């Protein structure tokens, strides 16, 4: 039986619902020897900023039970290097490229969106709103509805590309943030970003990470992420991209049944460079084995069975 794995997200038709999560495969080309990028629904590259960033002081990453905490600090070569050097090289992989952007002010987000508008090789923008707003005392944009709306609105006004707002879980009620992003013009939402976390080195009696705090990802956050997708699916009508601890196709199915139209594989890529392709292949096999002709039949299905 031929099954349909294609999904529609923010005006894009993706061959399957499996994406890479930003920051876990670099700009994609680093993983090309190990991961068939053309077999993915889309490649989400690591976050870029207006100017190059050196990132946080080391140590930047540490393992925890069932997860990883990272504090890389958005190290990247800047948007001009992306446009000039990286995007032209990605064209050979035949996969939609979604560019993640971040700024320290609303104006920086607007300028990034404007700079990338019309650049060949970009399918959509993912707006990383978990960054601190330097004009508001370092409060992350994505933790407050008005700041979320301000960023998304400026990005929307400065680009014709589809806009995907990436939501932070470090909030009281993620539904209010989702509604703010939707009201400001987001075409889709991705969730969740990492959970704020830290580890203390008990021998040295000091925080282990150079930045003190980091972002927790991996299987430890999956139940939190599934809950968030479930709630946001009930609150807004936008397509959702679910992420957070997806290691297998079974994990991905949890997100899809909770309401995600697509999923992003992140931390698993650090363990197995071919993880995202394996999830995509195993999802297709699941559909065949279960006699399900179209993966879209499963989107939000758990809500229709008494949830």
Curated annotation (Swiss-Prot):
Keywords: Cytoplasm, Flavoprotein, FMN, NAD, Oxidoreductase, Pyrimidine biosynthesis. Its cofactor is FMN. Its EC number is 1.3.1.14. SUPFAM superfamilies: FMN-linked oxidoreductases. It catalyses: (S)-dihydroorotate + NAD(+) = orotate + NADH + H(+). The active site is at 131 (nucleophile). Pathway: Pyrimidine metabolism; UMP biosynthesis via de novo pathway; orotate from (S)-dihydroorotate (NAD(+) route): step 1/1. One of its GO terms (cellular component) is cytoplasm. One of its GO terms (molecular function) is dihydroorotate dehydrogenase (NAD+) activity. It comes from the Bacteria. GO terms for biological process: 'de novo' pyrimidine nucleobase biosynthetic process; 'de novo' UMP biosynthetic process. The keyword Zinc-finger does not apply. It is found in: Cytoplasm. PROSITE patterns: DHODEHASE_1 (PS00911), DHODEHASE_2 (PS00912). Its main location: cytoplasm. FMN binds at residues 22, 46-47, 128, 166, 192, 218, 244-245, 266-267. Binds 1 FMN per subunit. CDD domains: DHOD_1B_like. The keyword Flavoprotein applies. Substrate binds at residues 46, 70-74, 128, 193-194. Coiled coil: none annotated. Catalyzes the conversion of dihydroorotate to orotate with NAD(+) as electron acceptor. Heterotetramer of 2 PyrK and 2 PyrD type B subunits. Belongs to the dihydroorotate dehydrogenase family. Type 1 subfamily. This is Dihydroorotate dehydrogenase B (NAD(+)), catalytic subunit. It comes from Desulforudis audaxviator (strain MP104C).
């Amino acid at each position: 039986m031929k099954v349909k794995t294609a999904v529609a997200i923010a005006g894009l038709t993706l061959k399957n619902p499996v994406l890479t999560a930003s920051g876990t495969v670099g700009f994609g080309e680093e993983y090309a020897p190990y991961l068939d990028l053309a077999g993915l629904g889309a490649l989400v590259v690591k976050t870029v900023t207006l100017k190059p960033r050196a990132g946080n002081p080391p140590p930047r990453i540490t393992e925890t039970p069932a997860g990883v905490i990272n504090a890389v600090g958005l190290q990247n070569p800047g948007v001009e290097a992306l446009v000039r050097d990286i995007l032209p090289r990605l064209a050979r992989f035949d996969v939609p490229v979604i560019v993640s952007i971040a700024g320290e002010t609303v104006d920086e987000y607007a300028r990034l969106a404007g700079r990338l508008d019309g650049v060949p090789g970009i399918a959509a923008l993912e707006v990383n709103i978990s960054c601190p707003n330097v004009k508001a005392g370092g409060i992350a944009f994505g933790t407050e509805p008005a700041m979320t709306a301000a960023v998304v609105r400026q990005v929307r006004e400065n680009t014709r590309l589809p806009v995907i707002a990436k939501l932070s879980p470090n909030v009281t009620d993620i539904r209010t943030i989702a509604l703010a992003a939707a009201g400001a013009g987001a075409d889709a939402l991705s969730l969740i970003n990492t959970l704020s976390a830290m580890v203390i080195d008990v021998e040295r009696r000091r925080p282990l990470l150079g930045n003190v705090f980091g972002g927790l990802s991996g299987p430890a956050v999956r139940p939190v992420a599934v809950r968030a997708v479930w709630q946001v699916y009930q609150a807004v009508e936008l397509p959702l991209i679910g992420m957070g601890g997806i290691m297998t196709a079974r994990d991905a199915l949890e997100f899809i049944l909770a309401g995600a139209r697509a999923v992003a594989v992140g931390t698993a890529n650090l363990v197995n460079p071919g993880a995202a392709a394996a999830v995509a292949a195993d999802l297709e096999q699941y559909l065949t084995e279960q006699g399900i002709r179209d993966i879209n039949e499963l989107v939000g299905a758990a809500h229709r069975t008494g949830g």
